[in-house]
């Protein structure tokens, strides 16, 4: 019999924060380019150990705005590394941190100006099958 690992209670889980940012660049950047730009900046400033500890992850991107997830204890290091980005593809680039929030929804409302952000719900297969049969 296979035993499943127990999930950690909320008090022991790593706390996350969401950094809203704006990119100032001449051309539109693709999501992959932004991920590489952020990853490179955090690695240069914070090192591989610090990068794994901060765990930066691009959650939302719609040029020129984006939301980056990181660990609560390392928010300041990630913000500092974003500010230090100076050029990309031999052109000047600047990333402005708009603010930090505890949820993606509040970051979108407060810093990106999205009035009613879409919520993603998990739809059960049974409901989908029932709707298709009707």
Curated annotation (Swiss-Prot):
Cellular location(s): Cytoplasm
Q: Which UniProt keywords apply?
A: Cytoplasm, Endonuclease, Hydrolase, Nuclease, tRNA processing
Q: What EC number(s) does its UniProt record assign?
A: 3.1.26.5
User: What catalytic activity does the UniProt entry give for this protein?
Assistant: Endonucleolytic cleavage of RNA, removing 5'-extranucleotides from tRNA precursor
What Gene Ontology cellular-component terms does the record carry? Answer: cytoplasm; ribonuclease P complex
Q: Which GO terms describe its biological process?
A: tRNA 5'-leader removal
Which GO terms label this protein's molecular function in UniProt?
A: ribonuclease P activity
Q: Which PANTHER family match?
A: RIBONUCLEASE P PROTEIN SUBUNIT P14, RIBONUCLEASE P_MRP PROTEIN SUBUNIT POP5
Q: What does this protein do?
A: Part of ribonuclease P, a protein complex that generates mature tRNA molecules by cleaving their 5'-ends.
Q: Which family does it belong to?
A: Belongs to the eukaryotic/archaeal RNase P protein component 2 family.
Self-association and partners: Consists of a catalytic RNA component and at least 4-5 protein subunits. Forms a subcomplex with Rnp3 which stimulates the catalytic RNA.
Protein's name in the database: Ribonuclease P protein component 2
Organism whose genome encodes this protein: Methanocaldococcus jannaschii (strain ATCC 43067 / DSM 2661 / JAL-1 / JCM 10045 / NBRC 100440) (Methanococcus jannaschii)
Lineage, please?
Answer: Archaea, Methanobacteriati, Methanobacteriota, Methanomada group, Methanococci
